[in-house]
Amino acid sequence: MRVPVRWVLWDVKDTLLKVRRSVGEQYCREAQQAGLQLSPAQVETAFRLAYKQKSQLLPNYGRAQGMDSQVWWTGLVRDTFGQCGVHDPALLDKLANNLYHNFCGPENWEVFSDSNSTLKSCTALGLKQGVVSNFDRRLEGILRGCGLLTHFSFIVTSEDARVAKPDPAIFSQALERCGVPASSVVHVGDHYVKDYLTSRSLGIRGYLLNRKDGQKTHLDIPPEHILQSLDELPARLQHNTD
């Protein structure tokens, strides 16, 4: 007998919302206000390299090393602008502080057109909803500013959980909050390993959101586990399709 769905867990970035402009553009806008003229493409390249290096050296915002996300992001901003020839410590700290707080605001985020309607539909089906995200502690404020926070009963961020996807332990923490068997829980996210495979490894009903090319990229996934739009989810949940 199929266990009915009781909860829906959500990834956030690139699932429910996305960065409104590229990181290179946003960093350059902040630098311009400080009198610097930099190329967005150059800053974007520098950011990607710095992010990769720092994520390998100090994964999950350096939580295992006793850091918090603001310290981690400050270091990343310094490294990014340093590659672009900006080395003034006071200026770098100012840029880092401004950018950290700027990304708390809804003006830097764009909610996908199918997010709000799908969240409302899940609530109408009697489902409770939560968040499992490799994000830092700013996420609650971002969701509030974007008008999404009220849909969720809880938020588990990797910073607060001290563990990040694809470690299944972050999903285990979310399941404890749900208080129901994993088979009664759905998870929706856009990353094949971090969201789909990891949630499925615990018995959660994982769905992979693949807005760009649907089934083409992941031929090993049953078609009924792939969403090309969040609009497809409510009907699948209503019929309890696995």
Curated annotation (Swiss-Prot):
Domain of life: Eukaryota
Pfam families, A to Z: Hydrolase
InterPro entries reported in the protein's UniProt record: HAD-like_hydrolase_domain, HAD-like_sf, HAD-SF_hydro_IA, HAD-SF_hydro_IA_REG-2-like, HAD-SF_hydro_IA_REG-2-like_cap, HAD_sf
Gene3D superfamilies registered for this protein in UniProt: HAD superfamily/HAD-like, Haloacid dehalogenase-like hydrolase
A GO cellular component entry from the record: nucleus
NCBIfam families assigned: DREG-2, HAD-SF-IA-v1
Family from the record: Belongs to the HAD-like hydrolase superfamily.
Protein name as catalogued: Haloacid dehalogenase-like hydrolase domain-containing protein 3
Organism this protein belongs to: Danio rerio
Protein's gene: hdhd3
